[in-house]
């Protein structure tokens, strides 16, 4: 048998070579553990992490190399085992049995060389191999010296290492120790999978946890890496993905029902579907009932919750063991149970993803027997007007399944009640009642929407979330391994229907000269600066990712010119968008092509005898990069990705159907690009815009999030959210919401005085729903800032005043302030508020009184914690 050992000097040289190869280090020849790393750009963090892990192993080997005698592998293993046993006794961990190696006297007599073939008379000794007793795996036992059939295969000793993360790693300690240890060090961040059949007996780790490759100090990082790898697995399987890719927003009636000129086949298919739809048994198997327990926050006593209550809803099953329902069904949920049709058993469900903006949620259950004998529903295209539609669900008035029938009456962009965002929706005349929410709406056996809201004022007006919105939600999860949300343009606009207004802006003259089409264009009145600013470097590629103009093929005009993959693959770093726009042949209409001339730096049009053609060109000489992307106030939007914007803010959806132009951006994903044709200073040009989430001063929804609050001396402070805004009667807040939608800074919040609790120190204060302007003469930025101002000392107050005095709510609220100079902030808290009547009123509290009665106030009003800030 070959025995592997080395002298301390040889091991030092060997390890130095390994570290030089693996990490490009410079090491001191006298102390190989102290190395200076040659860091390249972007590798500081990676190298420092790897070096730390290697140093852990070096410390172990360093202790071994301090021994002056010849070291054998069996001695190394025994030494590691003894150290682990000592630690195990101290920490009183669960006892494990590890392989222990016995020394061989005859082997100890061998001189120190790199390789040595032991004579056969030594192998024939009747001594057991110290590794043989502990090898439970038959594949490993074949290397035992007692196995006569394998005498010619005893050139290696295989050590089987099993990590605590259940991953098996097999290493060979061969005579070539350099390559062996080098392989180990170079593959620290890689998982090695070895197909080794485990026997019924448990194979214990060869090295204890402290000596394993990913152990102790790196345990948290390894867990995070495992979690990240699990997150990268998409929940959208191939069947569902194929179904989603076939859904189109602009499919015509001919595309849905069949090819042109094949009417007979279409009629036969429709008849078959109707005959099959008379029973609908298989579709019933795909619809489930939800039993949800919820606990909503109390908006009056903001530190408490309302008592728990139970609601019911509907959902339906799709491919991949997924269940689709409405987000408002499971908001603030503490437990969700689901029940199949025709089955009395209830299964506990869990939430995978929630999109509150479009009111969709994905559920599943860990009990996979639930999906036995169910039918996964498939999605269909956007329905056409007058299509017969069937809704299935569990509405109020009974416990069993209910089916209603109606027709598609309208497709438009309207507000979603749950989020207060505008998205595409489908109006139907089938009645929907509480409990129908989350159920499927079917056309020809395909899901074309999710039932979610109705119009109470009129009869038989209900709405469903169209399949195109559902498809975007699922594809976003598949693409980004998480739900990132919808992109918005981030502007306010005014329709340009008035002829006098169009004349003043120069549009009438452009129409007469046939430079632009008639009745197109909207005026931008306000722009979210954080969305359009180049200074924020938002138009540059982040993390070296490629950002395409949408994920699908968006045609600029009616020809097949792709603005997506052909050009935007090179959009990295500092991109010259003027050059990009010039390089793309911008198509302006189906009858007129506008081309770009790179040499002359002009965008011009061909002229022929057709009266609908446009005669103009735009000279791009002297254009800087700043002017080629982003929108500005007073710009007039004419086209978005080749689609004309009408003067009322609508755009053609398909055929002669029109919807709000916001839907063009709802088709795209976060960080997608679009080309927008505008009129700026009475000149026509094209600019690039990258789409982001818009940061609103008042969140449009705050579901599943508890309101922030801070209670001081019986005064309850909070931030203005939509849930609070609905219940406030302050006209100043109404003005604030009407005229100020976008945040000026990312951390801006409107801090409000929600109410004042009756206490001994709040006598005479009866204000509610008031805006907090200042604390101790310093303007309040957000709730966290307010807490800092109240709890600060005199010295920190001066520093805070100098640091934060420039920031002011006057950008949102205009008021005149009179400074109070005689304030002793060590004992007095002075709060300036704007009341519901528009008055600026001071509230003064004594810090000593607050400290004295603080515990009493908490006890009276059952306040367990005086603040909730995140």
UniProtKB/Swiss-Prot annotation:
Top class in the EC scheme: hydrolase
The signal peptide annotation in the UniProt record is 1-29
Question: From the record, what ranges are coiled-coil?
Answer: none
Start-end of Basic residues biased regions: 138-151
* Domains as described in the record: The PDZ domain is dispensable for protease and chaperone activities.
For this chain, the family text in UniProt reads: Belongs to the peptidase S1C family.
* Name this protein carries in UniProt: Serine protease DegP homolog
Q: Which organism is it from?
A: Plasmodium falciparum (isolate 3D7)
